[in-house]
């Protein structure tokens, strides 16, 4: 579930991991 990681990362750091 890489999308979940992206969402959490985005919410936590402010940028997306692709």
Swiss-Prot record:
It comes from the Bacteria. The keyword Hydrolase does not apply. InterPro entries: Ribosomal_bL33_sf. Keywords: Ribonucleoprotein, Ribosomal protein. One of its GO terms (cellular component) is ribonucleoprotein complex. Coiled coil: none annotated. Belongs to the bacterial ribosomal protein bL33 family. This is Large ribosomal subunit protein bL33. It comes from Ectopseudomonas mendocina (Pseudomonas mendocina). The gene is rpmG.
